[in-house]
């Protein structure tokens, strides 16, 4: 069996949190770290190797240049242009981050990369589309973490309100990984029942779905302002997506995908439900949205396309 290899490009907070999650779940044989700060990345390599030594089996933690990537299965891009300033949004990061990515991806393609790109760098949807354009790879092999973390937060919030397991909840967020994202309540259910039907039966009252959706959207910014970064949640998101790709789980996750006619749109990447396989995105699930959700999706598309046009 071919050893499974993941390269993490950017060994900052998100990259190292993802690396630690990979070590704990240990379903890859080699974890490769890439960072411009050679001293820091070597320190992280040693620290992670120590952590891996406590786990069963063998896992190699190595350091390479990004261009040394011909044998890599999944390349995770977590590079950042630096911390957000007060009042900035994810979209404010675009220009500086775009310049960094435009220097990395062509070098990787020259180095023979033929795997799958997973983008966690913000603004996720715009950078995912940029990486697809730069790489020349089929669109199914370039995806972003998108709104899978936001979807998971939504499920966690509902689970806490209802005192049930988050895995029992089918609820989704679609759109931009940012301010214009929205919950798809028309396709959300708990044990096969609409969310508020179940809530009325269990609690005797409806949940404030609007507030729950807003909380799911805003949690990332709250974490950032409280501790200076987000790392563990997105790190876990990266590892879960990779696990479903390697296993060929055929499970649908709301990740950022390049659209080509789905939802009547093209020329962008956006968070939608997608079935994952060992080749990346096997199928994009087109949900029939209600009128309000269609308007929200169109707004999110407009936000993303405006940013894409600026790079």
Swiss-Prot record:
GO biological process: glycolytic process; lactate metabolic process; pyruvate metabolic process
Pathway(s) of this molecule: Fermentation; pyruvate fermentation to lactate; (S)-lactate from pyruvate: step 1/1
Pfam families membership: Ldh_1_C, Ldh_1_N
Record function comment: Catalyzes the conversion of lactate to pyruvate.
Sequence positions that bind NAD(+): 14, 35, 40, 120-122, 145
Keyword set, alphabetical order: Cytoplasm, NAD, Oxidoreductase
Keyword Oxidoreductase: yes
Family per similarity comment: Belongs to the LDH/MDH superfamily. LDH family.
Record GO cellular component, one term: cytoplasm
Active site: 177 (proton acceptor)
Residues binding substrate: 90, 122-125, 150-153, 230
EC number(s) from the headed UniProt entry: 1.1.1.27
Organism of provenance: Listeria monocytogenes serovar 1/2a (strain ATCC BAA-679 / EGD-e)
InterPro entries according to UniProt: L-lactate/malate_DH, L-lactate_DH, L-lactate_DH_AS, Lactate/malate_DH_C, Lactate/malate_DH_N, Lactate_DH/Glyco_Ohase_4_C, NAD(P)-bd_dom_sf
UniProt-recorded name of the protein: L-lactate dehydrogenase 2
Enzyme class: oxidoreductase
Signal peptide: none
NCBIfam families: L-LDH-NAD, PRK00066.1
Catalytic reaction list: (S)-lactate + NAD(+) = pyruvate + NADH + H(+)
HAMAP family: Lactate_dehydrog
Primary location recorded for the protein, binned into one broad class: cytoplasm
Molecular functions per Gene Ontology: L-lactate dehydrogenase activity
Subunit structure: Homotetramer.
Protein's cellular compartments: Cytoplasm
């Amino acid at each position: 069996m071919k050893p499974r290899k993941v390269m993490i490009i950017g060994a900052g907070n998100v990259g190292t949190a993802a690396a630690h999650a990979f070590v704990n779940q240990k379903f890859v044989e080699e974890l490769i770290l890439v960072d411009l700060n050679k001293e820091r990345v070597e320190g992280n390599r040693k620290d992670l190797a120590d952590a891996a030594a406590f786990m069963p089996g063998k896992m190699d933690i190595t350091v390479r240049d990004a261009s040394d990537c011909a044998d890599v299965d999944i390349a995770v891009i977590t590079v950042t242009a630096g911390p957000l300033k007060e009042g900035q949004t994810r979209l404010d990061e675009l220009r500086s981050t775009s310049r960094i990515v435009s220097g990395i991806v062509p070098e990787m393609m020259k180095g023979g990369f033929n795997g799958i790109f997973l983008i966690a760098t913000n603004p996720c949807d715009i950078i995912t589309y940029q990486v697809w354009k730069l790489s020349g790879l089929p669109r199914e092999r370039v995806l972003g973490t998108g709104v899978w973390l936001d979807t998971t937060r939504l499920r966690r919030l509902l689970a806490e309100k209802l005192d049930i397991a988050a895995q029992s909840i089918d609820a989704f967020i679609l759109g931009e990984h940012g301010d214009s994202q929205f919950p798809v309540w028309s396709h959300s259910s708990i044990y096969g029942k609409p969310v508020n039907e179940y809530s009325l039966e269990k609690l005797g009252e409806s949940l404030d779905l609007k507030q729950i959706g807003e909380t799911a959207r805003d949690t990332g910014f709250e974490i950032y302002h409280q501790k200076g970064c987000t790392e563990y949640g997105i790190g876990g998101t990266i590892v879960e997506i990779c696990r479903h790709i390697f296993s060929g789980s055929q499970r649908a996750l709301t990740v950022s995908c390049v659209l080509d006619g789905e939802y009547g749109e093209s020329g962008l990447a956006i968070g939608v439900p997608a079935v994952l396989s060992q080749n990346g995105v096997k199928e994009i699930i087109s949900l029939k949205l209600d009128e309000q959700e269609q308007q929200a999706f169109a707004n999110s598309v407009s936000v993303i396309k405006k940013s894409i046009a600026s790079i």
